Amino acid sequence: PDENSFDAEQESKFLKEKSESENEIEIIAVVDNVVAGTAGIEAVGTKYKVKHRAELGISVAKEFWGLGIGWALMNACIECARNAGYVQLELNVVAENTRAIAMYERAGFVEYGRNPKGFQSRKTGFQELIYMKMEL
C-alpha cells in the first residue's frame, strides 16, 4: 500500500496484461468483497541466462493473517511457475517477517543471502532482506 500508485485504469491494464501472459500471473484473494491478499510470479528476465527464473511476491492484509490465504496464494503461484516451465522461484522477505519466513521454509524455500539495508520503510527505516529460492 505504501508504494501503490496505480489508478483504476492502470490497475486494470496491469491485471489484463498478467491474465494474457503465458509465464506470469497475478492472483487476488477476495473475502466478503474485500481484497484480502495478492500474489504473483514475474519473470526475472527474458534473456536466455535468466529466463528459467521467476520471482514470487505475496501480500496479505493483516486482518486476514492466520486464515491460510498466504499459503493458498503461494501454492497457486508455485503451481503456475511449474506449469510455465520455470526451474527456480525466488523471493525476498523482510527478516522481521518471521511468519512469512516460516511459511516459505515449510513450502521448501531456502535462504541464499541477505541484504542488511535491502528494504526501506517510511515508518521504520532500513530493514534487512532475506533472499530465498526454491528449485521447481
Which residues fall in each region the model found?
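Acetyl-CoA-dependent GNAT
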Residues: 3-63, 74, 80, 135-136
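Residue-level preference for beta-strand/loop junctions
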Residues: 21, 52, 85, 126-128
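Conserved beta-strand core positions
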Residues: 54-56, 89, 130
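Short amphipathic helical patch at the helix-1/turn junction of helix-turn-helix
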Residues: 60, 94-95
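Conserved active-site alpha-helix within GNAT-family acetyltransferase domains
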Residues: 67, 71, 83, 96-113
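Conserved GNAT acetyl-CoA-binding A-motif
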Residues: 74, 81-92
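Conserved catalytic-core motifs of GNAT/GCN5-like acyltransferases
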Residues: 90-93, 105-125
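Terminal substrate-recognition subdomain of acyl/acetyltransferases
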Residues: 126-136
